[in-house]
């Protein structure tokens, strides 16, 4: 499949993408990063509806849409009819009736998108910007793009995902696709935040068992808004037991990279001074987020043409 010929009706989960489609999106993101342009004969309208706080995902989608020449219809939850009790379904039904081509949505409800993509009335396409602790496909794709740029392949790479596993949509999206692409996965973090689901994709370990063996060390944000982690750990204890300290950083392979979906809780998941260390690709992830989201929006617009 050519990188600029992928066409998607919606993008709601990594599970709905084939390996071929994933690679096409990654390669198209790299092409956009290298200066490729997309040209459209007509204007397209994209609405960004974020029902949870977001900086990177929200603004990266906006920049991606602007770079593609789309008209943006930004949606402020605080001033919308959501405050009058309007359901998500009726909000998106309205967007569809107004002629919006794509709705990018972040919502706290897991699988919120199912009734939207199954509706015979809603014609707008749905791009999932994160559904509770469910899926985060655009973050997963930018992570994959970052790894692919570094190593040129996924087969045989050793990847450790460490931290707040159970509450992380990033972990769930990444474990599924990385396993499919041939990576060897390890999961580290507090036992309280490990569900059996992860054991189907990799091995549970301590961070000290793998930090010197893996190619990718991916830390996860502690999800303060989804649980009270300080009832189990102090910030200092969490960092000492499960975070990236200087000593652990020094043990990483010279060719290994450090990743985090951000925002980083500095001195909790990663020592403050290591966030921009030489092995860190956290800033690169943010940059790649714009270009892979350009690839996503382009692919969905192509899907609407069919």
UniProtKB/Swiss-Prot annotation:
Protein role: Catalyzes the condensation of carbamoyl phosphate and aspartate to form carbamoyl aspartate and inorganic phosphate, the committed step in the de novo pyrimidine nucleotide biosynthesis pathway.
HAMAP family per UniProt: Asp_carb_tr (MF_00001)
Keywords: Pyrimidine biosynthesis, Transferase
Superkingdom per UniProt: Bacteria
Keyword Transit peptide listed: no
UniProt-recorded name of the protein: Aspartate carbamoyltransferase catalytic subunit
Organism: Streptococcus gordonii (strain Challis / ATCC 35105 / BCRC 15272 / CH1 / DL1 / V288)
KW Transferase (keyword) present: yes
Listed InterPro entries: Asp/Orn_carbamoyltranf_P-bd, Asp/Orn_carbamoylTrfase, Asp/Orn_carbamoylTrfase_sf, Asp_carbamoyltransf, Asp_carbamoyltransf_Asp/Orn-bd
Catalytic activity: carbamoyl phosphate + L-aspartate = N-carbamoyl-L-aspartate + phosphate + H(+)
GO biological process: 'de novo' pyrimidine nucleobase biosynthetic process; 'de novo' UMP biosynthetic process; amino acid metabolic process
PANTHER family: ASPARTATE CARBAMOYLTRANSFERASE, ORNITHINE CARBAMOYLTRANSFERASE, MITOCHONDRIAL
Gene Ontology MF annotations: amino acid binding; aspartate carbamoyltransferase activity
Pathway connected to this protein: Pyrimidine metabolism; UMP biosynthesis via de novo pathway; (S)-dihydroorotate from bicarbonate: step 2/3
The protein's assembly and partners: Heterododecamer (2C3:3R2) of six catalytic PyrB chains organized as two trimers (C3), and six regulatory PyrI chains organized as three dimers (R2).
């Amino acid at each position: 499949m050519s990188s600029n010929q992928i066409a998607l009706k919606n993008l709601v989960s990594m599970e709905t993408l084939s390996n071929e489609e994933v690679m096409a999106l990654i390669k198209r993101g790299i092409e956009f990063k290298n200066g490729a342009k997309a040209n459209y004969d007509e204007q397209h309208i994209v609405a960004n509806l974020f029902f949870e706080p977001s900086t990177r995902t929200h603004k990266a989608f906006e920049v991606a849409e602007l770079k593609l020449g789309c008209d943006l219809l930004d949606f402020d939850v605080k001033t919308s009819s959501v405050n009058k009790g309007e359901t998500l379904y009726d909000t998106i039904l309205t967007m569809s009736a107004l002629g919006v081509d794509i709705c990018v949505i972040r919502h706290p409800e897991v699988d919120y998108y199912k009734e939207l993509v199954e509706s015979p009335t809603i014609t707008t396409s749905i791009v999932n910007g994160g559904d509770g602790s469910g899926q985060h496909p655009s973050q997963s794709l930018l992570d994959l793009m970052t790894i692919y740029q570094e190593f040129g392949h996924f087969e045989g790479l050793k990847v450790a995902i460490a931290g707040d596993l159970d509450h992380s949509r990033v972990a769930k999206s990444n474990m599924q696709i990385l396993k499919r692409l041939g990576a060897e996965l390890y999961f580290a973090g507090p036992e309280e935040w490990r569900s059996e689901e992860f054991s189907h994709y990799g091995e549970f370990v301590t961070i000290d068992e793998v930090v010197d063996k893996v190619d990718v060390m991916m830390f996860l944000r502690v999800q303060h808004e989804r649980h009270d982690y300080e009832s189990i750990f102090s910030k200092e204890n969490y960092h000492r037991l499960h975070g990236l300290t200087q000593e652990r950083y020094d043990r990483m392979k010279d060719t290994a990279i450090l990743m985090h979906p951000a925002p980083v809780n500095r001195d909790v998941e990663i020592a403050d001074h290591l966030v921009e260390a030489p092995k860190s690709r956290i800033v690169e992830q943010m940059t790649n987020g714009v270009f892979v989201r350009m690839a996503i929006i382009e692919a969905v617009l192509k899907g609407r043409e069919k």
